[in-house]
Amino acid sequence: MANTNIKLLLRGETPRLIDEWQIAPKFWDAVRNEVDKRDDDGQFILTGSAVPPSYDEIFHTGTGRFAWLKLRTMSLWESGDSTGEVSLAKLFAADRTDYFVEGINPIDLEHLAYLTCRGGWPKALDKKSKQAALQQAFEYFEAVTRFDVSRVDGVNRDSELARRIMRSYARNQGSQATAGTILADIANNESTEVSENTIYSYIKALKKIFVIEDSTAWN
């Protein structure tokens, strides 16, 4: 329907949510045009788990019409696992002379390890057992390496190589690991020759589906 009568999909009560809009990139310009006609804020919410595979069907940047918001998994405070007694924002505030760090953390080391592995996936929080909650991360990892890393731009990629790259990224978390570093890390277990360009291709695909996000300098 997006290819035949996209305006029909924009009708209805607002704000109107269009999920996974990147599957039909024509929504971008259609929404931009509709926003100009209505001349009102908060008309549409476009959500997606990846960037569009191609921008050939997008002809306008959307400047002045769209506001960007990046969603991540929940923090421990959002999931209810942290008391939130210590504020990171206040710790790094310019004027913090009157802020005293105090609080009691009920989380022991074993439970902290569990929370780290579980992550902040909303679906994981609804599970009745820890094992079921942990399984969500494994299922996401499997879906990313089997399907999403190739589907994002239509390039057929090896799922096992995708797994090794993600594991290498995990081992190098918090460091400035180059493609060469990743390549050297996985070379010992890779039977076929892999180039840096191939590594870059996988990394680019993983960034497009928001699996990898480079940390910016905090200062």
Q: Where does each model-flagged region fall?
A:
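Short glycine-rich substrate-engagement loop in P-loop NTPases that contacts/grips substrate
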Residues: M1-P15
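Structural recognition of the conserved hydrophobic beta-strand(s) that form the central parallel beta-sheet
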Residues: L17-I18, Q43-S49, K70, S79
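Conserved Walker B
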Residues: E20-A24
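Conserved catalytic/switch belt of AAA+ P-loop NTPases
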Residues: W28-P52, H60
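Short regulatory helix/loop adjacent to the ATP-binding pocket of P-loop NTPases
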Residues: N33, P52-W68, G80-E85
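Conserved small helical "lid"/interfacial subdomain of P-loop NTPases
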Residues: T73-A94
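Amphipathic alpha-helical "lid/sensor" segments that cap RecA-like P-loop NTPase cores
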Residues: R96-A143
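Accessory nucleic acid-recognition modules appended to NTPase machines
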Residues: L125, S129-N219
